[in-house]
């Protein structure tokens, strides 16, 4: 559990769910953190500010096996992105290995499994890591910065991924020489300290 590792080293933690019943159960489960925890409904398919959330006010969002259930994943990611400060992080737990047939067999009978209206998810509401990376880059994120997955996809087809909310400033800080933000036009000299490596050579050409 995240809170077991955080202890009280955080200012506030907002627990969200579309169901009020789940929020009530969560309040009982996390009763020891009542001074720092807030419980509010959140529908990722709606704009965050229309639900009483302040935009760009969160340092991190943790989404556990939920984004893929949206009718439109791109819009859901944009809604979550609006919650994050520039430079904030989104942590995703999602089913990314699409090979195990047992998952489709077990979940295929549930209406929510077919909630998506996207054409590329006709047979299963899951995306590969490459698809997640591309979609995240299109919706205001850096793409998948890191992915942790089991070596045996059949045994554990889930991945934990981290991506960063980016704007021009954050993109510049992440990759100064590749950012769309231009350097000072009056800069006459640029010193690159990196030794005689291939990466340094690529930067200087």
Q: Language-model features: where?
A:
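4′-phosphopantetheine-dependent carrier domains
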Residues: 1-205
């Amino acid at each position: 559990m995240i809170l077991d590792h955080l202890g009280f080293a955080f200012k506030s933690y907002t627990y969200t769910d579309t169901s009020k019943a789940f929020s009530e159960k969560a309040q009982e489960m996390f009763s020891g953190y009542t001074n720092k925890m807030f419980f509010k409904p959140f529908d990722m398919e709606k704009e965050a500010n229309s639900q009483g959330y302040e935009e760009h006010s969160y340092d991190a969002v943790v989404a556990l096996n939920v984004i893929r259930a949206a009718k439109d994943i791109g819009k859901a990611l944009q809604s979550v992105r609006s919650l994050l400060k520039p430079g904030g992080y989104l942590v995703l737990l999602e089913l990314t290995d699409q090979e195990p047939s047992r998952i489709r067999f077990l979940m295929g009978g549930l209406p929510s499994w077919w909630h998506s209206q996207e054409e590329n998810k006709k047979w299963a509401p899951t995306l590969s890591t490459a698809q997640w990376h591309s979609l995240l880059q299109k919706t205001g994120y850096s793409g998948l910065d890191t992915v942790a997955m089991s070596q045996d996809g059949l045994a554990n087809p889930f991945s934990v991924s981290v991506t960063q909310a980016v704007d021009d400033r954050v993109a510049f800080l992440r990759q100064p020489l590749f950012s769309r933000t231009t350097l000072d036009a009056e800069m006459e000299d640029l010193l690159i300290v990196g030794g005689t490596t291939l990466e340094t050579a690529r930067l200087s050409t």
